[in-house]
C-alpha cells in the first residue's frame, strides 16, 4: 500500500517537472523572438543598446555634414527660390510642424516609408509651383510682346491715316487755289470785255445801232458775250439793247438759257404760224422738226459762201 502511494507521488512530481520545463522553454523562445524584432516607437539604436551620448554625438555629426552641404544646395536653388519666395514662405508657414526636404539631399535609407512619401509629395508640389510660376511669367512676357506689337501697328495705322488726311488737305487747298486763280482770270477777262463806250456822238450811235442790228440778223444765233465784245459794250448793256429792239419791233427772236440770242425774221414767224393753222393740233416734237425747216439759222455769210 505504501509502495503504491510513493510511486503515485513520484509520478505526479515527474509530470509537474516536465510541465514546468516545457513552459520555461516556450517563454524563452518568446523572449528571444521579441528581442529579435525592433520595437515600434523605440529608436533602433536604443533597442540595440547603444548609449544615448553616442547617439547624440552621431546626430551632431550628421547635422554638421548637412550644414556643410547646405550652401551648395542653396546656390543651386537660388534662382527658383528668388522667383518663388512668396509661395515658399506660404508653404513654410503652413508646414511649420513638419519636416522640409533639403534640395539635392539624399533621403535617409532608414527613414520610414510614410515620412519619405510625405517629403516626396512636398517636393513634387514645390516643383509644380515653380512650373506654374514659370508658365505664368512666360504668358506675361508673351502678352506684353503682343501688346507692344499691337500698339506699334496702331501707331503705324494712325500715321498712315494722318499722312492721307494731310495729303487730302493739301490737294484740296491746291484745287481751291487754282479755282480761285481761274476765277480771278475770268473776272479780269469779263471786266475787260464789258468795258465799252457808253457815250458817243449821235451819228456814231445810229451807225453803231444799225451795225448792231445787222450783225444779229447776219449771224442769226449770237452769243451775248461775243456780241458785247464786238461792240465794246457790257454784256448787260447788250441784253438791254436787244430787249429794247424787241419791244419796238425792230428785232424778233428769243434769248435762251445758254446766253444766246436766236434771231427769227417776221417772214419765218409767219411761216410757222401758217403751219400751225394748217395742221391744227401740233405736238412739240412736230413743231420742233418743222421749225428746223421753216426757220433758217445759218449765218448770212456762211449761206452766201455755200451758195
Curated annotation (Swiss-Prot):
Cellular component terms (Gene Ontology): endoplasmic reticulum membrane
Protein family (similarity comment): Belongs to the DDRGK1 family.
Protein's name in the database: DDRGK domain-containing protein 1
SMART domains tied to this protein: DDRGK (SM01128)
Membrane-side (Cytoplasmic) residue stretches: 24-307
Skewed-composition ranges (Low complexity): 52-83
Annotated SUPFAM superfamilies: Winged helix' DNA-binding domain
Bilayer topology annotation: Single-pass membrane protein
Topology, Lumenal side: 1-2
Annotated spans, Disordered: 31-175
Originating organism: Drosophila virilis (Fruit fly)
Subunit record text: Interacts with Atg9; the interaction is transient.
Alphabetized UniProt keyword annotations: Endoplasmic reticulum, Membrane, Transmembrane, Transmembrane helix, Ubl conjugation pathway
Transmembrane feature ranges: 3-23
The protein's role, per its UniProt record: Substrate adapter for ufmylation, the covalent attachment of the ubiquitin-like modifier UFM1 to substrate proteins. Required for ufmylation of Atg9; protects the nervous system during aging, possibly by stabilizing Atg9 and supporting its function.
Record carries keyword Membrane: yes
Compositionally skewed regions (Basic and acidic residues) per UniProt: 107-175
Matches recorded under InterPro entries: DDRGK_dom-contain (IPR019153), DDRGK_domain-containing (IPR050899), WH-like_DNA-bd_sf (IPR036388), WH_DNA-bd_sf (IPR036390)
GO molecular-function terms, A-Z: ubiquitin-like protein ligase binding
